[in-house]
Amino acid sequence: MALQTGEPRTLAEKIWDDHIVVSGGGCAPDLIYIDLHLVHEVTSPQAFDGLRLAGRRVRRPELTLATEDHNVPTVDIDQPIADPVSRTQVETLRRNCAEFGIRLHSMGDIEQGIVHVVGPQLGLTQPGMTIVCGDSHTSTHGAFGALAMGIGTSEVEHVLATQTLPLRPFKTMAVNVDGRLPDGVSAKDIILALIAKIGTGGGQGHVIEYRGSAIESLSMEGRMTICNMSIEAGARAGMVAPDETTYAFLRGRPHAPTGAQWDTALVYWQRLRTDVGAVFDTEVYLDAASLSPFVTWGTNPGQGVPLAAAVPDPQLMTDDAERQAAEKALAYMDLRPGTAMRDIAVDAVFVGSCTNGRIEDLRVVAEVLRGRKVADGVRMLIVPGSMRVRAQAEAEGLGEIFTDAGAQWRQAGCSMCLGMNPDQLASGERCAATSNRNFEGRQGAGGRTHLVSPAVAAATAVRGTLSSPADLN
């Protein structure tokens, strides 16, 4: 990334330059000011302990927001948390936030939910910001034209104490997606196809800017889905330049600017675009019209194929490391090469997570489930990304559609995205999930995960095998 030189700059470079407190001059890290710090119960306890031991306070508590998400149950939330480790982490977060004066949205609060859903819904996430959280999927917030990234626990402490972070400039990547998306193809299919194309290390060391007519046509929810999974491509962050879609989403939200402050903010936001002539370190191109519903078959997000394809044969792979990884993945997933993806039966379907737990995602699922039933032998969990999302879904009658279909309509939380709460797979169970990671044991020890879009998840629940809504007609 380039410092201010008068040369054309990318969006990421502009935001970076606007937040340099002290320049490292290319020899040392730059000290970057942080506009918004998001906190949850898993990665923050040691950071607060560090502050306490050093006798420090939180530098800017008003720029810090905490919520309970990873460990919380999604049923019986009025009861004590059963797991002692989860209970301790949640209780510790509550004590730390009370002691250090940090806003916290706890279970039962209408604004409680997954931190990467809560920030945008409150209007805290805004264009041009630097945003960090002790969570890799902080890249979600880049959908608003923010530079947002996950950080480690020691960095969480540094931001709490100073509201700054020492960082070395990143490389920049442009992912250009042009053309019209076919019917039934979503943002989730775009990002899964991209990761399959460039690999889980393809974006390493980069900030990705998603560009092109297909990206511009997406809703904010769709853009958040894509930016959310930038980390699965190895990138440090992902972002989309703000536009009228962004401004319309933010207008009127609780923490969005109003009146003259809105007008001032809008002037700045409208400048947040990559300059003509700016040079990216890497450029990637996808043809939107060529995309189709996508699904993973292996144990990393890059091991995916179109739903219409079959499980690949490792023996046809020319790269030794790729072949060995595929063989190991197929053994864990209990799949045979050549099996049609549509013939793979599932035991469970999970709709939710910071990737696909927003109201637009739930509307897509409801449209597929309306008048249909979840297949016998399939357990379907639908978990809203926040209590605010749940309330909106209830107001629109979506909850009734879910329960009428035989799905479990839960309270807000990270849920079955990861095995840190009661919502887990049993060993050997197979799940179609709208979440972001399909690692071994991610959804519970021995569980097998296929990453899919909300539409594919809903159709899969109805048919009992990996399917798209078109397969139901």
Curated annotation (Swiss-Prot):
Cofactor dependence: [4Fe-4S] cluster
This entry's comment on the bound cofactor is: Binds 1 [4Fe-4S] cluster per subunit.
Which Gene Ontology molecular function entries are recorded, alphabetically? Answer: 3-isopropylmalate dehydratase activity; 4 iron, 4 sulfur cluster binding; metal ion binding
- EC annotation? 4.2.1.33
Question: Which reaction equation describes what this protein catalyses?
Answer: (2R,3S)-3-isopropylmalate = (2S)-2-isopropylmalate
CDD domains on file: IPMI
Q: In which pathway does it act?
A: Amino-acid biosynthesis; L-leucine biosynthesis; L-leucine from 3-methyl-2-oxobutanoate: step 2/4
Main EC class of this protein?
A: lyase
Q: Which UniProt keywords apply?
A: 4Fe-4S, Amino-acid biosynthesis, Branched-chain amino acid biosynthesis, Iron, Iron-sulfur, Leucine biosynthesis, Lyase, Metal-binding
Annotated positions binding [4Fe-4S] cluster: C354, C414, C417
> Which GO cellular component does the record give, naming just one?
peptidoglycan-based cell wall
Entry's SUPFAM superfamilies? Answer: Aconitase iron-sulfur domain
- List the transmembrane segments: none
A Pfam family per the record? Aconitase
Question: In its UniProt record, which GO terms are filed under biological process?
Answer: L-leucine biosynthetic process
The record ties this protein, via InterPro entries, to: 3-IsopropMal_deHydase_lsu (IPR004430), Acnase/IPM_dHydase_lsu_aba_1/3 (IPR015931), Acoase/IPM_deHydtase_lsu_aba (IPR001030), Aconitase_4Fe-4S_BS (IPR018136), Aconitase_4Fe-4S_dom (IPR036008), IPM_dehydratase_rel_enz (IPR050067), IPMI_cat (IPR033941)
Q: What assembly does the database describe for this protein?
A: Heterodimer of LeuC and LeuD.
Q: Per its UniProt record, what PANTHER family does this chain match?
A: 3-ISOPROPYLMALATE DEHYDRATASE, HOMOACONITASE, MITOCHONDRIAL-RELATED
Entry's family note? Belongs to the aconitase/IPM isomerase family. LeuC type 1 subfamily.
Describe the function of this protein: Catalyzes the isomerization between 2-isopropylmalate and 3-isopropylmalate, via the formation of 2-isopropylmaleate.
Q: What is this protein called?
A: 3-isopropylmalate dehydratase large subunit
Gene encoding it?
A: leuC
